[in-house]
């Protein structure tokens, strides 16, 4: 469990496809079924969003999914319960994407206890500044759960080195300035940014935000170690276009042989 399980997803040159699902969107049975599907389809890690009323980093698709979940009465405890149940059936690593507020409202010690029980391997907290990460970092380290760092295009390299120096799991490299969502293409400077991050950190680097096509996936995994696909996966799951998710996974894995 934990850090080692995430490491294994990148071993021997593996490229990681990390889909994002919103916890409780469509109900808990649907969450469990979607995790089972993604596991069987060959995803490397699954990222599960904790819905929050003020999701500052999320684009419209993920915001809508979070609102649907909250409007239907989804709770953090309910998401953990669903993960506890589905964990008995799947081995895929779980990474939670949560804003800081739900963690503190739930109680950080209680939150981490539930993470352990649900077999959560890593956590991403997009609104937790590096300077304040000890709010939960030391507690997570004690129980071998990775606190995944985010770095952005605007982060100076010194800051990237600082942010990632004590981190575990992988580095989440945000590939656009702004919020998540589907985009047509990526600017040339994104390539040099990813190459720069890769050359300065000792962890796998995963690109995320705005990745939505096979071409995007192929472009990104040529440079880095994997991709997170969020808004597009939510759209495809909503529209029952699961074959297209399998195609994105295949595009990722194809680059392992390259």
From Swiss-Prot:
Name of the top EC class for this enzyme: lyase
Protein known as: Tryptophan synthase alpha chain
UniProt function note: The alpha subunit is responsible for the aldol cleavage of indoleglycerol phosphate to indole and glyceraldehyde 3-phosphate.
Catalytic activity: (1S,2R)-1-C-(indol-3-yl)glycerol 3-phosphate + L-serine = D-glyceraldehyde 3-phosphate + L-tryptophan + H2O
Keyword Lyase in record: yes
Keywords, comma-separated and alphabetical: Amino-acid biosynthesis, Aromatic amino acid biosynthesis, Lyase, Tryptophan biosynthesis
This protein's encoding gene: trpA
Species lineage: Bacteria, Bacillati, Bacillota, Bacilli, Bacillales
Catalytic residues identified in the record: 47 (proton acceptor), 58 (proton acceptor)
Keyword Zinc-finger: no
Organism: Bacillus cereus (strain B4264)
